[in-house]
């Protein structure tokens, strides 16, 4: 079942106060977990309602989805004419947004800034930022309203504070995979990953498919110890991605448009094929941060 809730923010004393709809600084949709045995009976509408995040960005707003799968929050912040803040809320029972959480951000839009406790970080397109647990103030702005930044966010619970780190795309750990012959030539850019920096449990990166390639994560896999969220973008007009999900012997698909995200439970495969090449951001949290801790599946074994 899907619940949509409006967030509240705290006043100067840390007291939760309800506010008028027009003043709400961000929106949160809560998604409860689902079982694989149930999911194989879902209709297309139910599958989309459970796993698809249709709207990630809206001007001067923060659109967030809270999944009870490992309690990840995925969403987007798109400041245009004003700054947008992430603040404490009743859903998190916290005085500040990152009171008990860590966060990763990748900017897919124009140049912008993120202020963390008064320290500003400039992010151009494809730059990333890790913010450790305990940061008190988070503010997002765009340099040019005509070309606004689009900050894609993943955040999950944390147990320790690690330093805030800016990760330019040039500093990401790069893993070329696939080939032209198999239509899956791509580069995995690992931003928040033990090979680059320390975090509690969040891993986050961006995979870029080469022109002429349209398959991601194929051969596919599952990883029982981590859930994952995919965010598809850089998809050309009038093109789509067929995102594959479900247990390996009970596969289903979701039609994804540009700048949409999808929740992948730990029991589900997660792969896709587009009608053109595209880019996607992946974020994981769970039991460990071992990127290669996965159960690979031969394509001929899929059903």
Where do the language-model regions lie?
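Short, Lys/Arg-enriched N-terminal segments with co-localized hydrophobic residues
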Residues: 5-25
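Hydrophobic, proline/glycine-rich low-complexity stretches
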Residues: 26-89, 93-94, 102-103, 302
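A short glycine-rich, His/Asp/Glu-containing loop-to-beta-strand
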Residues: 60-92, 185-228
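Acidic/His-leaning functional-site neighborhoods
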Residues: 66, 198-269, 274-277
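A short beta-strand-loop-beta hairpin characteristic of the jelly-roll/cupin
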Residues: 97-125, 232-258
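Acidic, low-complexity central loop/insert segments
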Residues: 109-148, 152-157
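Conserved metal-binding segment of the jelly-roll/cupin
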Residues: 123-142, 255-276, 285
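Double-stranded beta-helix
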Residues: 145-186, 281-303
